[in-house]
Amino acid sequence: DTQTENVIDFFDPLPSSSYAVFDSGYKYMFDRFNNEFRYIPLNGDIAGLMARTSINQFSWFSPAGASRGAINGAVKLAFNPSQSQRDLLYPKRINPVVFQPGSGIILFGDKTGLGVQSAFDRINVRRLFLTVEATIERAARAQLFEFNDVITRSNFLNIVEPFLRDVKAKRGITDFVVVCDETNNTPDIIDSNPVSYTHLTLP
């Protein structure tokens, strides 16, 4: 149908990226500043769902569905995809926003704009790793200009490992390994003074 094809045709040329999120359209809402109803793009709402999920739960929870994906202030949708339309949109990286009786208007997809199959084609996985990477970066920055010795490496591990245990306890990851010892800090690396670590996380 024309609506589905128009949405797919718009997003198809856009580059593949796990840092982007595509949705299916516009909501009809009241514009109190101009005292009239108008159609507004949903991308601001999708960003708001992610912020609300981070505040009320954690960044690694999906912002979609009846529990966390409710679109506020929407009277109706310009395009309310049916099941068959959703089946066409979702493989094309487009997250449908739909009206569901009993739930209202909700985000009904969790895809990033990544064009290949990967763990990072899910919004919650990408946001999990953004959170983990930022914390590890801060921990590493705190060790700048310190000696590459057991004490410095222990300080780094004492920041990172409890954080990852907490993420695991809160259902963000299933397991993790952090290696920061003599196996990946060889004498050559120690002589040149950077601290090397290996981090493996299973979402």
Regions found by a protein language model. Give the residues of each.
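Structured, hydrophobic secondary-structure cores that serve as assembly/anchoring elements
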Residues: D1-L200
